[in-house]
Swiss-Prot record:
InterPro entries: Idi_bact, IsopentenylPP_isomerase_typ1, NUDIX_hydrolase-like_dom_sf, NUDIX_hydrolase_dom
Enzyme class: isomerase
GO cellular component: cytoplasm
Gene: idi
CDD domains named among the record's database cross-references: NUDIX_IPP_Isomerase (cd02885)
Organism: Serratia proteamaculans (strain 568)
Catalytic activity: isopentenyl diphosphate = dimethylallyl diphosphate
Identification of the protein by name: Isopentenyl-diphosphate Delta-isomerase
Domain Nudix hydrolase span(s) in chain numbering: 28-160
Active site: 65, 112
Length: 179
């Protein structure tokens, strides 16, 4: 069965639900989250999406991302998906939210009200193979350079966050996660 996503208005008020496939085909605004996990050295955990994903397969992105279920808080969903996707838990704190709309491969449209969470973890992730093909701890400045040189290797939402917020904000998030 196709996952149901929460449709929202411009202020993130729930206004209904729709199947994930239809949401991405029609570019409907829906609630989502993006998690940025840092280690004590200030490096960001990136995941390479599984090659079996129906969009953005094999692309590098932030540590974890997903959608809450109806009646589930965004924080609870973020904690659940971090465990399911990457095999660990971390204390998460919300640092921002934003709305974006972008075309993704496969004639699909991402249109998300995206809640951004940060956390600290110093272990080795145990990524679920159906979610994450690989992972890497990456220096923020090197990541900034890589996203500029090779944007085609990254998801549209991750590039949007990197472009809009930049390395200074990422470094601030790393310090916040460590505090």
């Amino acid at each position: 069965m196709d996952e149901m996503l929460i449709l929202v208005d411009a202020d993130d008020n729930a206004i209904g639900s729709q199947s994930k496939t239809r949401v991405h085909q029609q570019g409907l605004l829906h609630r989502a989250f993006s998690i940025f996990i840092f280690d004590s050295q200030g490096r960001l955990l990136l995941q390479q999406r599984a090659f079996s994903k129906y969009h953005s397969a094999g692309l590098w992105t932030n540590s974890c991302c997903g959608h809450p279920r109806w009646g589930e808080s965004t924080l609870a969903a973020a904690q659940r998906r971090l465990q399911e996707e990457m095999g660990f838990s971390a204390e998460l704190q919300q640092v921002s939210s934003f709305t974006y709309q972008a075309a993704v491969p496969g004639d699909l449209i991402e249109h998300e009200f995206d809640h951004i969470y940060v956390g600290l973890f110093d272990g080795k992730p145990q990524g679920a193979p159906e979610e994450a093909h690989s992972w890497s701890w990456t220096d923020i400045q090197q990541l900034t350079d890589e996203t500029t040189r090779n944007p085609e290797k990254f998801t549209v939402w991750f590039l949007t966050i990197m472009k809009d917020l930049g390395a200074n904000e990422m470094e601030r998030w790393a310090r916040l996660a460590a505090s």
